[in-house]
């Protein structure tokens, strides 16, 4: 199925990120974040992307206006080279009922449905090539942490497309599918843990009399700066924490109080709960 450039005779990759026709099934937050990131990064021409969601035509129309993508009818799925499942895992069977007649084995299928295995998507698409992803909402600002795995019918050309699509949108890691539930709990759900910490810090400062907007600005910059230091220093979070925790100082007092209140245990409990839920979704 390799494509050839008639004018040069050069053999092109099976999946060329600049020429594929990419159809999104679903127009929720993750689909919107993905579209925004792909358009802003210039990864895929907007006119090569379409969004299919007859249940929410208003959102599709807005995405078309904002990003120049096609608010597509289901029939457009026939023309697509790559179909991207961006629906909730619970609605995957319904999506297959609605659009299954457009699924053919010569297409590539991408999925971000938590807990839905490559095998399940393969079974619904005639044993086509499938790549399963777990990104997060930071796709929209090209700061996502994304992991992916290949289905049994996908090979290195599909892996190359996965890298080409997601590398401009943040950090990308290829992993065995067995680790995708862990990724879901860590980086897929992780932004919500971060936001919860932000909320708690802002509320604490506001309750202490600080202007809420000032508290927000200081909190966001503090956490952004701390993350940047870890990324660029190469040191472990433990080493960095110990370095700034002076004996009998304010940081030591604060960290000790957090741990006494069960901070680390609470984070681990949240991670494990999200991981279990990912596994449960895959069984529904």
Give residue ranges: language-model regions.
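NAD(P)-dependent Rossmann-like dehydrogenase/reductase catalytic/cofactor-binding core
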Residues: 3, 14, 18, 220-284
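Short pre-catalytic strand/loop immediately N-terminal to key active-site residues, enriched for Gly-Thr
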Residues: 130, 180-185, 237-242
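Internal alpha-helical scaffold of NAD(P)-dependent oxidoreductase catalytic cores
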Residues: 50, 120-129, 145-182, 195-232
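Rossmann-like NAD(P)(H) cofactor-binding subdomain of soluble oxidoreductases
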Residues: 34, 66-67, 71-148
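NAD(P)+-binding Rossmann beta1-loop-alpha1 motif at the extreme N-terminus of oxidoreductases
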Residues: 3, 9-72, 144, 206-207
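Small-residue helix-packing motif on alpha-helices
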Residues: 49, 60, 92, 211-218, ...
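Short acidic capping loops at alpha-helix termini that bridge into adjacent secondary structure
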Residues: 45-49, 105-107, 213
């Amino acid at each position: 199925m390799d494509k050839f450039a008639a004018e040069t005779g050069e053999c092109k990759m099976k999946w060329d990120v600049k020429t594929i026709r990419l159809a999104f099934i679903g127009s929720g937050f993750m689909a919107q974040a993905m579209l925004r990131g792909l358009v802003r990064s210039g990864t895929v021409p907007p006119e090569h992307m379409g969004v299919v969601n007859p249940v929410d035509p208003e959102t599709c129309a807005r995405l078309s206006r904002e990003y120049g993508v096609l608010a597509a009818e289901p029939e457009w799925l026939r023309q697509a080279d790559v179909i991207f499942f961006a629906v909730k895992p619970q609605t995957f069977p319904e999506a297959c009922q609605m659009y299954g007649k457009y699924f053919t084995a010569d297409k590539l299928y991408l999925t971000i449905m938590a807990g839905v295995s490559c095998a399940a998507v393969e079974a619904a698409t005639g044993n086509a090539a499938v790549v399963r992803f777990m990104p997060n909402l930071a796709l929209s600002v090209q700061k996502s942490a994304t992991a992916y795995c290949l289905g049994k019918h996908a090979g290195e050309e599909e892996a190359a497309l996965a890298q080409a699509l997601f590398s401009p949108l943040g950090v990308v890691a290829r992993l065995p599918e067995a680790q995708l539930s862990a990724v879901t709990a860590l980086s897929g759900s992780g932004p919500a843990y971060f936001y919860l910490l932000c909320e708690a810090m802002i509320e604490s400062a506001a309750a202490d009399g600080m202007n809420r907007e000032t508290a927000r600005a200081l909190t966001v910059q503090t956490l952004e700066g701390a993350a940047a230091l870890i990324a660029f220093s190469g040191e472990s979070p433990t080493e960095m924490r110990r370095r700034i925790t002076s004996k009998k100082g304010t940081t030591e007092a604060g960290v000790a109080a957090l741990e006494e209140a069960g901070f680390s245990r609470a984070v681990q409990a949240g991670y494990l709960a999200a991981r279990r839920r990912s596994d449960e979704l895959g069984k529904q």
